[in-house]
Amino acid sequence: MGILNKIFGTYSERELRRVNPIVNKIEALDEKMQSLKDEDFKLKTEEFKSRLEKGEKLDDILPEAFALVREAAHRTIGLKHYREQLIGGVVLHQGRIGEMKTGEGKTLVATLPAYVNALTGEGVHIVTVNDYLAKRDRDLMAPVYEFLGLKVGVILHNLNNEERQEAYGSDITYGTNSEFGFDYLRDNMVVYKEERVQRKLNFSIVDEVDSILIDEARTPLIISGQGEKSTEFYKVADYFTKSLIAEKDFTIDEKANSAMLTDEGVNKAENFFKVDNYADAENMEIQHHVVQALKANYVMKKDKDYMIKDGEILIVDEFTGRAMEGRRYSDGLHQAIEAKEGVRVERESKTLATITYQNYFRMYNKLSGMTGTAQTEENEFREIYGLDVIVIPTHEPIARIDNADVVYKSEKGKFKAIVDEIVERYKKGQPMLVGTVSIEKSEMLSSMLKKKGVPHQVLNAKYHEKEAEIISHAGEYGMVTIATNMAGRGTDIKLTKEAEEAGGLMIIGTERHESRRIDNQLRGRSGRQGDPGESRFFVSLEDDLMRIFGSERIQGIVDKLGLAEDEAIESKMVSSAIESAQKKVEGNNFDIRKTLLQYDDVINKQREIIYKQRSEVLEGEDLKDQIRDMIRDVAYTAVNSHISGVEEEFETELQNLVNYLEDICLPKALVKVKDISNLSDEEIKEKLLEAVENIYSNKEKEIGEEQIREIERVILLRVVDTKWMDHIDDMDHLKQGIGLRAYRQQDPVQAYQFEGSEMFEEMIYNIKVDTVRYLFHVEIEKAPEREKVAKETSTNYDEDSVKKQPIKKENRIGRNDMCPCGSGKKYKNCCGRMA
């Protein structure tokens, strides 16, 4: 490959040769654009829209449109896209990932493809990692878009429904990945189409694309409601787990991030919980709580994986070091950590709707992304998202010096050397950014520097609010900044003149991350736009990466050299061993994400079917034919499942059939066994169907056609939502235990697909049964007024937005009847409580 690259150039270089002629055309139009009057810019936008309506393609107008944006940016915000930024814009428009180094002006680059793709009127989403960046980027670039006659909006966490609809109705919408994803899920939970906020997913430009599509890929978006299980057992399991002895009662697998009981531990569990066989299926609940308590106590680390703030457990993002407010670990792990730390144990939540970022972003017609570091994950982008990575050349050559790693025998020796290095460089006024892997490590280093009298600022999850401000000062003369991993990403570090003369920004990595990309991101904070700078990583054999994944050869070499604690080695062999350990972990993580996607694809196909049908119900008012089909299916399936054809059991089967249908749609004693005992199966079906249809026709006349159609819609939507929520839970439980199928020589993914498909068919049938049951049992004096129901079922975007709001209707329903809202509860325990 190396020789071929030398002859033909890398893939990126070959692709850039194709882009260059387009960029030449854009630059050639510069003079023409300069001659335009200010008022001409909006007219040009209208002209482009008209040309597109007449059949021209976006690519036909691209050179002129890009040249127009370039001049508009120059006139409004004083910035003119340089050649490399124009290249980046073309790459993004083509639906690719542009790798652009820190400080190359990604925010400005996005204006080019955003403008061109917004001309179709179908909307463009520009995605960033947090609210601060979304608002900042919108505010910076809004003058450009507005000068061109486009409307620009931003989605922030605290917006209400109307504000969201307005923002999504804009030509270009800025927002965070989580807000876009949650809005999609909420849109598929509404009862009236007027409540939906998003339009169709057209074109998305994802900033920090590696962070969102790879680092976040394993974290599903979940809208949840309060579960009903008690939390007491988490405390019991925690008490038991704290009595265990490491290695004797349980073992820890650091590679898999899990802990397991040994045989001795199992014996202790059986004695403690007073069960005969811990592994028995009926003890699954105990196993589940013990596994989570083990993980909470012996795998999850405080101030690394999570932190405590105001008596609440907050997850710490392993890639950014940010506290993830509002996020909770699923499957009871969060509750287990709460029990471990002695804070209030919240109830386990029930999933109402969920999707992964992988599947959300794959729904866009066109997807593109920008980041400073994507090449190491090129295979994953191509395989999962169909995106290729093009490395965009920098405007100025990179002047940063990347030094070789220095390796120490112990962590203590390493940190002593880091402090010495900081003190030395501080004396000459060189600014430093020191990257740590956890809050705990950053605070330890901070206290060591305090003892040495070195003033510094600390940036980690605990000081999240000041993030952008702290990072913006990191390039000043003599400034020392300690930051967990990638905190402050998206904010430029600009050097002062004195800092530049002192050698530029020095990056010190206190540990190698398991991903080369994260290390490259840290390095990339220095040397922006040709600035001077330097970087070096300090590594010890006690670091997690070296301990868990490093080879024994390195340990052997260090032992032979007989290194003292504070002596270091710089060796190419050690550096390449570190890199191969990282590649091993990256490959392992990619495989995990790929397997998770195979599982998620099963429920994703089911989600698409449910949401598509749900959308059709929202759009079309008249469900008469669908409801009639459901009534027929329920009646026919009941006959088929109750009558076996065995003559001796015929009378009993008929009685069971009548009882079953009386629970769903037949009034008591309307059909007697003797009336149908002499009929064939087909005749029984016809007779029962005729009786049921007559009852429903009478109900329709009694309530009125318009009102019954409205009730059908609301009840069907509620039943679909309730059954879908239960199905998500069932699929999750299936997935938890499916890995064990490998012991039976079964492919777990295939088993999940097959059984998941059967469960889905069963859910579809249960939707029909419950819809028919509620429609036959509901008696309404007054039809639900659209506005009233819309108000009562609207999605709120405050902290309680995940709670399911029951529909209130003026019904004549018995207190012990099933509630017609579709919750599956009795009326007295559901909407009846509100009456």
Curated annotation (Swiss-Prot):
Positions that bind ATP: Q85, G103, E104, G105, K106, T107, D492
E.C. designation(s): 7.4.2.8
PROSITE patterns: SECA, SECA_MOTOR_DEAD
Enzyme class: translocase
Cofactor section: Zn(2+)
GO biological process, alphabetically ordered: intracellular protein transmembrane transport; protein import; protein targeting; protein transport by the Sec complex
Membrane topology: Peripheral membrane protein
Binding site for Zn(2+): C819, C821, C830, C831
Cofactor notes: May bind 1 zinc ion per subunit.
Compartment(s) where it occurs, according to its Swiss-Prot or TrEMBL record: Cell membrane; Cytoplasm
GO molecular function: ATP binding; metal ion binding; protein-exporting ATPase activity
Catalytic reactions of this protein: ATP + H2O + cellular proteinSide 1 = ADP + phosphate + cellular proteinSide 2
One GO cellular component, as annotated: cell envelope Sec protein transport complex
CDD domains, sorted: DEXDc_SecA (cd17928), SF2_C_secA (cd18803)
Keywords: ATP-binding, Cell membrane, Cytoplasm, Membrane, Metal-binding, Nucleotide-binding, Protein transport, Translocase, Translocation, Transport, Zinc
Chief location bin: membrane
HAMAP family (alphabetical): SecA
Family from the record: Belongs to the SecA family.
Subunit architecture: Monomer and homodimer. Part of the essential Sec protein translocation apparatus which comprises SecA, SecYEG and auxiliary proteins SecDF. Other proteins may also be involved.
Protein role: Part of the Sec protein translocase complex. Interacts with the SecYEG preprotein conducting channel. Has a central role in coupling the hydrolysis of ATP to the transfer of proteins into and across the cell membrane, serving as an ATP-driven molecular motor driving the stepwise translocation of polypeptide chains across the membrane.
Name of this protein: Protein translocase subunit SecA
